[in-house]
Amino acid sequence: MRSLKFKVSDPVGLYATPATELVNFVKQFPCHLILKYGSKEVNLKSMMGVLSLGVPTKAELEIIADGEGEKRALDMIEDKISELGI
């Protein structure tokens, strides 16, 4: 199990457009991916779950990966987060 922590930099927060791109991107990975915001945890591969968090700007998030290819997944997700400006 590995994790990646980051702060949301988009002034609108984690809204539908980048969330959709991120969710679609992570579906390629076989490992289990959890997005954690405060005490809430959702499946990062679930669009409804991610949007249900209502993540504002400057929020601190954690992505937890568990299973096959977890290191590669987090490395690629970190790059994608930067690319999307989340």
Where on the chain are the PLM-derived regions?
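C-terminal structural segments of small proteins and small subunits
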Residues: S52-I86
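Detector for methionine-enriched segments
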Residues: M1, M47-M48, M76
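Compact, glycine-rich, soluble single-domain proteins
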Residues: K7-M48, S52-P56
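Intrinsic-disorder/low-complexity, polar/charged segments enriched in Ser/Thr/Lys/Arg/Asp/Glu/Gln
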Residues: M1-K5, E60-E62
